[in-house]
C-alpha cells in the first residue's frame, strides 16, 4: 500500500515477484491547481483505499494466502522524513495485518520507487549502485549499498524537482495535474522542434532547475 501526494496505490505480489493485482488511482485535483494540501490528499486516500483494498482481496485465492502486509510510512528512509499522507496507508495496513493475523513491514516511498524497478531489472543483484529518482517532488542521485546499509544522496537538484517543472508548465498549457503523461503524448505527436532552453550547468553533481521553468514560461508568452 502506498499513499503518496498524488496517487493511491494497492498491489498484491507473490513470493516470486509476480504481480497478481495492481491498482493505481490519481487523486482529484481541481483544474488549474498545481497539487493538493496534505489534509485534502489524506482525506481522498481515506475515501479511495477501502474500494481498492476490497478489489485486491476479492479473489479468495489471494485473500486466503496473504502472508504479510507492507506499506509506505514516509517519503525517504532518513530521520525526520515525514508527510501526513502516508499515515492513511499505514493506518489501513496495520489494521489489515491485525485482522488477518499476519506481520507487516514498513518502507519509504522512495525505497518503493527504487525496488519496483530494481527487482525486475538486470540490476536486481548489483550492489552497490547509483539510482536516479525523478518525480513530482524529487530529483536525486542516490548511492545505495545494501550490505553497508547506505542510502545516501550524492547528487540532484538544489531547488525544484523535474516533476515540478513539468507540472507547472503543463498547468500553464491548460493540462490537468499531474501533467507528465499528457506532456509525453504531446511530445510523441509533435512535428519538428526548436531549442528554447539553455544547457543546464552541473556543479559537483547538483543542478538548479528553476531556470527551466522560467525559460518555458517566457516561451509560452
Residue ranges and their predicted role:
Residues 3, 11, 22, 125-126, ...:
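A short helix-loop
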Residues 7, 72-77, 108-114, 138:
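Acidic, glycine-rich active-site loops and adjacent beta-strand->loop/helix elements
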Residues 14-19, 84-95, 100-102, 120-125, ...:
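A glycine- and small-aliphatic-rich helix-loop capping segment at beta-alpha/alpha-beta transitions
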Residues 23-25, 44-60:
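Short, well-ordered amphipathic alpha-helical segments that serve as non-catalytic structural scaffolds
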Residues 54-94:
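Short beta-strand-loop/turn "lid" adjacent to the catalytic site in phosphate-handling enzymes
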Residues 102-130:
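Conserved phosphate-binding catalytic cores of ATP/NTP-utilizing and phosphoryl-transfer enzymes
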Amino acid at each position: 500500500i502506498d499513499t503518496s501526494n498524488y496517487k493511491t496505490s494497492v498491489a498484491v505480489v507473490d513470493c516470486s515477484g509476480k504481480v497478481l493485482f495492481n491498482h493505481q488511482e490519481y487523486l482529484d485535483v481541481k483544474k488549474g491547481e498545481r497539487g493538493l494540501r496534505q489534509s485534502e490528499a489524506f482525506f481522498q486516500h481515506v475515501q479511495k483505499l477501502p474500494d481498492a483494498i476490497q478489489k485486491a482481496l476479492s479473489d479468495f485465492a489471494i485473500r486466503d494466502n496473504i502472508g504479510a502486509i507492507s506499506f509506505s510510512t514516509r517519503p525517504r528512509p532518513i530521520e525526520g522524513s515525514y508527510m501526513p499522507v502516508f499515515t492513511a496507508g499505514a493506518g489501513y495496513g496495520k489494521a489489515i495485518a491485525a485482522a488477518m493475523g499476519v506481520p507487516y513491514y514498513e518502507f519509504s516511498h522512495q525505497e518503493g520507487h527504487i525496488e519496483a524497478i530494481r527487482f525486475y531489472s538486470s540490476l536486481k543483484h548489483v550492489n552497490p549502485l547509483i539510482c536516479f529518482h525523478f518525480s513530482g517532488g524529487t530529483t536525486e542521485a542516490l548511492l545505495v549499498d545494501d550490505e553497508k546499509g547506505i542510502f545516501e544522496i550524492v547528487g540532484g537538484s538544489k531547488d525544484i524537482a523535474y516533476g515540478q517543472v513539468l507540472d507547472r508548465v503543463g498547468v500553464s498549457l491548460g493540462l490537468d495535474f499531474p501533467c507528465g503523461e499528457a506532456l509525453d503524448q504531446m511530445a510523441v505527436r509533435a512535428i519538428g522542434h526548436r531549442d528554447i532552453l539553455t544547457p543546464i550547468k552541473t556543479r559537483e553533481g547538483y543542478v538548479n532547475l528553476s531556470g527551466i521553468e522560467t525559460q518555458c514560461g517566457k516561451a509560452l508568452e
